[in-house]
């Protein structure tokens, strides 16, 4: 397990998780989320290739439509 910060809150997740795993862990739709790791915004095609590490600061911005 590793400790990191997701949206400012400490989280403990499995070692080897990629960004897509983190998004799914928090039950978010990856098609409506923008992910930022340590201040770097990722493109959606990098979610599966980018591993999260101990101490990372992850921001998940979930877009919700409405009217």
Q: Where do the PLM segments sit?
A:
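Structural motif
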Residues: 6-8, 37
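Cytosolic Rossmann-like ligand/nucleotide-binding regulatory domains
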Residues: 32-38
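Short alpha-helix capping/helix-loop boundary micro-motifs
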Residues: 42-47
């Amino acid at each position: 397990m590793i400790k990191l910060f997701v949206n400012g809150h400490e989280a403990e997740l499995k070692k080897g998780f990629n960004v897509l795993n983190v998004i799914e862990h928090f039950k978010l739709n990856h098609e409506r989320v923008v992910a930022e790791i340590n201040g770097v915004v990722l493109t959606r095609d990098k979610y599966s290739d980018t591993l999260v590490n101990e101490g990372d600061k992850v921001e998940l911005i979930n877009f919700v439509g409405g009217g």
